[in-house]
């Protein structure tokens, strides 16, 4: 599945495939994809939501759907791209893709719903206005 969608995703993170990520069949085990997607989520939040305090806030995944289109081999050069496709009051929906850097082939796609959580108050909270605006500006959400 090859798509020209690069320009729709501003946040792109190259991924390193580790020795233990590859099974005896020579491909990356599908459980590892979730770790790759987490790397993209972490970079996205740190890049877009300036001043995000990981000791004060958490972001919980409340729903996740992953589609697998093609195997990732141990020698592949891959990256994950991330964008917000919907911004609610206390939650947001991310779309992510793992793709081959050389061919642009999309290997997997992930849709997830995440909730902002205040660790001190022990409850979900609304996004601060500055982060809400930063996400809108970064991903072109109206």
Residue ranges: model-predicted function:
Residues 21-30, 62, 70, 74, ...:
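Generic structural "secondary-structure junction" signal
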Residues 33-36, 60, 113:
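Residue-level recognition of specific faces of alpha-helices
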Residues 44-92, 107:
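Hydrophobic beta-strand-centered segment that forms part of the acyl-chain substrate-binding groove
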């Amino acid at each position: 599945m090859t798509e020209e969608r690069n320009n729709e995703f501003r946040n792109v993170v190259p991924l390193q495939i580790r020795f233990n990520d590859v099974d005896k069949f020579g491909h990356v085990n599908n459980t590892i994809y979730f770790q790759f997607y987490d790397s993209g989520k972490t970079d996205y939040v740190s890049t877009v939501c300036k001043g995000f305090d990981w000791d004060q806030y958490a972001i919980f995944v409340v729903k996740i759907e992953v589609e697998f289109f093609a195997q990732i081999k141990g020698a592949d050069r891959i990256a994950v791209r991330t964008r917000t496709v919907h911004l609610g009051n206390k939650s947001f929906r991310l779309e992510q893709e793992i793709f081959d850097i050389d061919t642009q082939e999309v290997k997997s796609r992930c849709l997830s719903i995440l909730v902002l959580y205040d660790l001190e108050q022990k409850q979900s909270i609304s996004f601060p206005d500055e982060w809400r605006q930063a996400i809108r500006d970064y991903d072109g959400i109206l």
